[in-house]
């Protein structure tokens, strides 16, 4: 007799409140990168201001997943989320649909855990001061993830184009043991930080290499299209460059495409991705003074790693 299939879980953002751990999410990504390299495919449709993306992945030993979502730049003015969608998770052995996960839940944990995994492998171990550039949707989860996983962080500064937005973010954070402050002088803040984590929608650089002191780790999140970037050529040329995935960043995202086109760097300037970095003996930070840059480009394989972690936790 054929086995009766169980109905897939629908996991909303509210369902997961208080049940997920940033440390466990980062560990899920680390472990996921010890598995065979994922097969991934992306489809992007629509104009720059209203894009639909479908990102699919298969990871041997983990399963299959597909996330479809829209990104509408003008939704904030409408009182709607900029990003909306859902993630489907399928069983690795028989292809059953196991879970449908709210896209913002996957994206929040994937994005911040991706950056923090990179920082845990590349930032100086004595890093104490974290600067968050941007106070949008991602910023709060970055503060929570960094301070949960890197307990040495004692000070968190937040900069935003609209100072009140940075202040509102600070006031909305609770349970953070680090000192929190909104800052208005971005060049000075960058120059004082040990880790700079930038999550903006910038199409022109907001972080200049001239501002960054030796030993800083710079985490670049915001750019996800070919015309977007957050760092200037000078920073990219000075730094040891790493990415979460060569496949989803090189040739796809302006953060790398634009400095390659200008001749500031080459594709070979990228020294490794997370598959490389998690391996024992990998090329990571070489000195206390080296500047490291990690481009968080995302990808369906990361979504699948995090969605599978969420589904396991929620299944009890």
Curated annotation (Swiss-Prot):
Its EC number is 1.5.1.49. This is Delta(1)-pyrroline-2-carboxylate reductase. Catalyzes the reduction of Delta(1)-pyrroline-2-carboxylate (Pyr2C) to L-proline, using preferentially NADPH over NADH as the electron donor. Is likely involved in a degradation pathway that converts trans-3-hydroxy-L-proline (t3LHyp) to L-proline, which would allow P.denitrificans to grow on t3LHyp as a sole carbon source. The lineage of its organism: Bacteria, Pseudomonadati, Pseudomonadota, Alphaproteobacteria, Rhodobacterales. One of its GO terms (molecular function) is oxidoreductase activity. Keywords: NAD, NADP, Oxidoreductase. It comes from Paracoccus denitrificans (strain Pd 1222). InterPro entries: NAD(P)-bd_dom_sf (IPR036291), ODC_Mu_crystall (IPR003462), ODC_N (IPR023401). The keyword NADP applies. Belongs to the ornithine cyclodeaminase/mu-crystallin family. The keyword NAD applies. It catalyses: L-proline + NAD(+) = 1-pyrroline-2-carboxylate + NADH + H(+); L-proline + NADP(+) = 1-pyrroline-2-carboxylate + NADPH + H(+). One of its GO terms (cellular component) is cytoplasm.
